[in-house]
Amino acid sequence: MAMGPPPEDGTVAVVVRVRPPTPSERDGAAHPVLHVVDQHILVFDPEEPGGPPGAALPPRGPKHRGKDLKFVFDRVFGEGATQEEVFQHTTREVLDGVLNGYNCSVFAYGATGAGKTYTMLGSEQSPGIMYLTMAELYRRIEARRDEKSCEVLVSYQEVYNEQIHDLLEPKGPLAIREDPEKGVVVQGLSFHQPKSAEQLLEMLANGNKNRTQHPTDANATSSRSHAVFQIYVKQQDRVVGLSQDLQVAKMSLIDLAGSERASVTNTKGERLREGANINRSLLALINVINALADAKSKKTHIPYRDSKLTRLLKDSIGGNCRTIMIAAVSPSSLAYEDTYNTLKYANRAKEIKLSLKSNVLSLDCHISKYATICEQLKTEVADLQAKLRAYEDAARDAGKQIPALLPPPRMEEAVPESCSAPNVCRESDGEQQELGAGQDAQLGGEEEVLEEMPPSSPSPTQQTDLQLGMKKPNRLPQRLSRSHTEMLMATILSVAQKQYSLLKAANLLTPDMVSEFEELQLLVQKEAAVSPQPTDTSGAPPALRTQRGCDASPSTLSAEPSVPTTRAALRRLQQLTALSSPKLVAKKRRRSEMSNTSRLETPHSLNTRAKRQRKSSPLSAGGEVEAQRSPHTPCLKEPQSPPLLPCCTPKICPLTVTKRRAPLMTSAAQNCCTPTVCDLNVTYSLSEDVAKPGALSLPRFPGWENAPCALKKQEGPFVPRASIPVFSMKGSSIPKPSSISKGSVQKRRGAVSNASRSLGGIQSHITSSSSRRSAQPQSIPEHPPPGLTWKGRSGPR
């Protein structure tokens, strides 16, 4: 079934080519009768001839049609136009239509000796339109070979004395038939399928040798027949399916024989009969052109059957075919009549209307071919999977070539303090934030805000690693100076780590890349475990060497000649020696206080602490264990943890910086502050007389009503009192006066006295965990502390 876009309207494109004058025309002093004004306008028989000045003009005969006639065409080529220029503006433009399923035809029309055969065939030095068109067609087919499969069939025939002959396989005259589906068909015509443009051009050259030519007085190489070279292009999508679209287009390149006058050519006998048949077929072609161009005429009959030539070109002129007519004319006044007639019919052909439609056929496959189609699809899928697998293997092998080229021994010496993975870098960031958590809680409940830091400024993690790397300044330079290869290894590994961090930050990591980086990490850790530890020339035991390294002063470290240090490094080293020990001791003290008050923690605080412990890094845990083992040691020993990045190696981790800002509103729950003393005393005052169990009532507790008012006051900041905590309770949980017994009052008084003994622990616990709780100013916990629980009946919890 024919499918495709709606028909497109158009007209026949007409171009005119003026050939250069021949030597005989120059010697005869014949003035030109054509003047090319520009690329579209041509003047016939101008008033001022373009001949040499002073040349005698031949007298005008009585048959001269007019003077100074102007013709407008789609393109006008002067005497100096080349074959390539004519091709660019004629058949090159219609090749796109052929590849899109449109029929196209290009034919040269004109008198004998006007240059039709030269324009279509050319010579070896200057090939014509047929040669250039075939070369360009195969070039475009090769460009779209991956998308569509193309098949090219060619045929070459001639019409000689109203008989059709095969030029590629010469044989007798062939009959012409009309098929309702295929159109005009020449019975017995051979079709050939060239594999390349060179093979096709060879076929074209052999066909021209079989073409009938004979010299006449008008033309030494006069063609005595009409040659028709047809190219069939069949295209199909490479994707196999149950229904496929098939595009079939036909392109006809026609070299017509020239009309001739018997009085001019002086032909007799066989040549005279040939000329008569040529003129008869051209007359039939002119009638067809007139009928197609006369749109106002009521005649619907087109005289295609008047000649074998017109029957053969029935589907190549007008209708569903993009047609280009090349009118070849002579500028000499000797061919005045022939030039005028050619221009007149060429101007007439411009009025032929076209209705272009793409020849797309939808082929539905029979059910018997479904199995074959499925096999083809499976084969195509297997081929694509094999190509994809080969591509992935090549990419994986290329990634493995980098560690394979590096020498495996002494891997840990090349990167003694580099992070084994980006997770270690992030864990060091968590340790740095946890060490400063105790100091942050004392700044008035400031809020921590994390935002990205530009790569140019160093992050706190980088500064910490830089200070830790300066503890052993004489280790890395000595090892890197041993071999240039080890330095190259360290550089490559740092670049790989940087690439991993950047890709992960941009969310561009693929599973293959992650596996490659993990293999590289495992290789580094494996080599670090296998490689022997470097020997120390001092001869001291390891503990003593560690003690000496910790007790060394910055001046002692900078005095060693083998360590290249800078002023910034010395300043950071001084900061390290001044600030590293207090942070660790404060952390140990804080953790010991938290362990003492573990019995007073609520379930919510236990969950918060469990989450905080899970966030802590292995490095910090290792440091705490070492500190607990040797609490009286003046300097902490080096923890057995993965090595950190040295100061000379670029550290690539998620760059974040911690900024602080004051909260929008201060509250007692956030700042661990208490209301005034009088409110607190009244709130928790209990009856002194044990013998009066019924004296407890709601009006005896004015602090419950004044607490919200005290929290809303903004005249002055709340003064933290470390001696008395604040406890509040929901109204629904207040026991009724009748439900309180004498024993419950005594137990409550004992619980309050026990709670007052551990107020210091509670206050320290509240201070350390206030920054991590998001409690509202008026929120009341559902579960009271275990030291102040109400016994007896209470409201719903």
From Swiss-Prot:
SMART domains: KISc
First-listed, main subcellular location of the protein, grouped into a coarse class: nucleus
Keywords: ATP-binding, Cell cycle, Cell division, Coiled coil, Cytoplasm, Cytoskeleton, Microtubule, Mitosis, Motor protein, Nucleotide-binding, Nucleus
One Pfam family cited in the UniProt record for this chain: Kinesin
A GO biological process held by the record: microtubule-based movement
Residues binding ATP, per UniProt: G110, A111, T112, G113, A114, G115, K116, T117
Role: May play an important role in microtubule plus-end depolymerizing activity in mitotic cells.
Name of the protein in its database record: Kinesin-like protein KIF18B
Annotated source species: Gallus gallus (Chicken)
Gene: KIF18B
